[in-house]
Amino acid sequence: MANILKTIIENDKGELRKLEKMADKVLAYEDEMAALSDEELQAKTEEFKKRYADGETLDQLLFEAFAVVREGAKRVLGLFPYKVQVMGGIVLHHGDVPEMRTGEGKTLTATMPVYLNALAGKGVHVVTVNEYLTERDATEMGELYSWLGLSVGINLAAKSPTEKKEAYACDITYSTNAEIGFDYLRDNMVVRAENMVQRPLNYALVDEVDSILIDEARTPLIVSGPVSSDTNQLYHMADHYVKSLDKDDYIIDVQSKTIGLSDSGIDKAESYFKLDNLYDIENVALTHFIDNALRANYIMLLDIDYVVSEDQEILIVDQFTGRTMEGRRYSDGLHQAIEAKEGVPIQEETKTSASITYQNLFRMYKKLSGMTGTAKTEEEEFRETYNIRVIPIPTNRPVARIDHSDLLYPSIDSKFKAVVQDVKERHEKGQPVLVGTVAVETSDYISKKLVEAGVPHEVLNAKNHYKEAQIIMNAGQRGAVTIATNMAGRGTDIKLGEGVRELGGLCVIGTERHESRRIDNQLRGRSGRQGDPGESQFYLSLEDELMRRFGSERIKALLDRMNLSDEDSVIKSGMLTRQVEAAQKRVEGNNYDTRKQVLQYDDVMREQREIIYAERHDVITADRDLSPEIHAMIKRTINRIVDGSSHSDQDDKIEAILNFAKYNLVSEDSISDSDLEGKSDQEIKDYLFERALEVYDSQIAKLRDEEAVREFQKVLILRVVDSKWTDHIDALDQLRNAVGLRGYAQNNPVVEYQAESFRMFNDMIGSIEFDVTRLMMKAQIHEQERPRTERAISTTATRNISAKAPNMPDNADLSNVKRNDPCPCGSGKKFKNCHGRKK
């Protein structure tokens, strides 16, 4: 272990030596750039672009380009990047993460690699965690970029598609991670190429990269539409039943935060819902409602996991920032179950139309880098998931902050009593204090206690984060006391007021250890910026969430040995800190394993999504007749139907193929048994394809010009693809839940998921081609005048496609259709799951 650690440290040192040499080359241009006039310095941008176009690489331009940005920043912003900032910029350009402490000027560091990569003209995305930082950084740094001749765009959720397209067309685009993800998904749902807003994803520089790529890695971005179903009553019934349970009726696993019914709970459910067996196949939907009601009532906590807004809406609280996540909803019915629990209006369920996780979104960029003050603890995950190295950058000035050892109290009450006393004493001497909490509930509790103690303070949590930047900016003033949920206000520097340095600087007090060491380090890092003095102190209790879930037994034993009878007794020891860090490492390991598994599942979806989106993009951008592609779909559909019927005896086979042809290819009275009898399978395939092409040509002939034909073909294909893809996503979600149970049968759930999803994907492709064939053959296309506008073309095409194939006639003879044959109605389903379903 010691050897591994030594190797890592030596590698870091070697990397830093290389970076220092490169930074010195940038600094060597300092006098040359200072001697240039404004016009000469600004002209460098066009010179670099020309040199890049003539074959020079960005790596070759780096030293001079970085020097131009340094000089430009000095003239425009009054800021001159230090050598360590130049080193950080080089790391960013190479597609890695420089770990730079809070207050070391990460925003200014980013200007150099952003400028350099923007010279290529392929777009640079600077990604921030919220829109306040997006606008702030784009406005402040945009001055420099504009002065140097580069265009800057700001992408906000409220902007129109036209404004978004303009923002993405700029050399540099500032945006939140969520908005880039949603724009990507929406771009893959449009019908016309001109409605897409993004260019191909080129280079992303992610601010607070650990927050986005690690903490939010599991969060799927979902574009969804409503599902018409009257299920509100079931949510209320399940909630009412769950609230009637005693503690013995359910089992909670505190460590994994899972819950299930005990035998007595199952008995009560069968009695309450009047069932013979709760786990009969017919009751699968009901058990899902009960499971969600259990989670909502006994796992999900008000003011910790979510808050109820003034508008009676359930808002999710981000566990890593303490902010509410506007517009986000728990999936799979959990959000509705919480609404039932809290007695607020239940919003309708939705069906996923498109989704992607941040892991797979950001892995699509050609080059990815990011900045943070705390990434080294997650180095393995950055390397394994994103192929990114983490390189610690030295501070410009030595860190003067004093980090005190943790204090452990027997109970939460005694802990908070000590926190309030400490805050009061520091406030009275004028030292500013930042109190960090992990939950809204804790913030409110400490606030109440400080009011009782007569200590004036500001509270910053999920309930009032609109003024967070202003509150955080004032947190370093003399006598200021600020309570902040976790890392709220991250990205905004706390600058010390007059006379505060002499009082010891800002004191950060942590009221609980977070499950991630990185989050604790971020809280500590709010103090002691740029060599300022400061202090940090964590207060813990045996009743804290982390201590309850992981590793508290040894610490309890330690307490017993010390025989602490006084409630206000406190432990302060190195062993305690080591035990807490060991507990945090276990949680981090669990979370990493979970994220890895999510990625394994999502990689399956990613491969399928990329195939569908690539095909979709090809259709949207095609400036040609798509008849060859549609002909191929028709041919494959016919082949599948004929091959699928070959196992039947001759009469049954002819009957099944005839029904398919009548209801999906040609008019009913234009084909009969005699047309198919006596032919081999290949001859039947050739005959039906020939007949289908005749119908296809007659359908196309009804459209008066090539533009109308292309529009009709595009809308037809896209409509079918989007419908089937949405159903497929829904089916994959259900499959993922189902394969989890197969793990109990000693099967690997991920392997099962991969195999089953591959089969389902192939089925979906067949279903897409079947529907395109059926709609193409049976759509009722009316002769029309040439439409005057694109909108008219689209409307007409959509209206034409809306004409469905005729339903199965009441007197249709289905006696010879086998259960596993395709249903002759043309639904694409097997007969047993369609018109052959037992009533």
Swiss-Prot record:
SMART domains: SecA_DEAD, SecA_PP_bind. It holds the Pfam family SecA_SW. ATP binds at Q85, G103, E104, G105, K106, T107, D493. GO terms for molecular function: ATP binding; metal ion binding; protein-exporting ATPase activity. One of its GO terms (cellular component) is cytosol. Keywords: ATP-binding, Cell membrane, Cytoplasm, Membrane, Metal-binding, Nucleotide-binding, Protein transport, Translocase, Translocation, Transport, Zinc. It catalyses: ATP + H2O + cellular proteinSide 1 = ADP + phosphate + cellular proteinSide 2. Residues 829-839 have a biased composition (Basic residues). It is a peripheral membrane protein. Zn(2+) binds at C823, C825, C834, H835. Its cofactor is Zn(2+). It is found in: Cell membrane; Cytoplasm. Its EC number is 7.4.2.8. CDD domains: DEXDc_SecA (cd17928), SF2_C_secA (cd18803). GO terms for biological process: intracellular protein transmembrane transport; protein import; protein targeting; protein transport by the Sec complex. Residues 800-839 are annotated as: Disordered. Monomer and homodimer. Part of the essential Sec protein translocation apparatus which comprises SecA, SecYEG and auxiliary proteins SecDF. Other proteins may also be involved. Part of the Sec protein translocase complex. Interacts with the SecYEG preprotein conducting channel. Has a central role in coupling the hydrolysis of ATP to the transfer of proteins into and across the cell membrane, serving as an ATP-driven molecular motor driving the stepwise translocation of polypeptide chains across the membrane. Belongs to the SecA family. This is Protein translocase subunit SecA 1. It comes from Streptococcus sanguinis (strain SK36). The lineage of its organism: Bacteria, Bacillati, Bacillota, Bacilli, Lactobacillales. The gene is secA1.
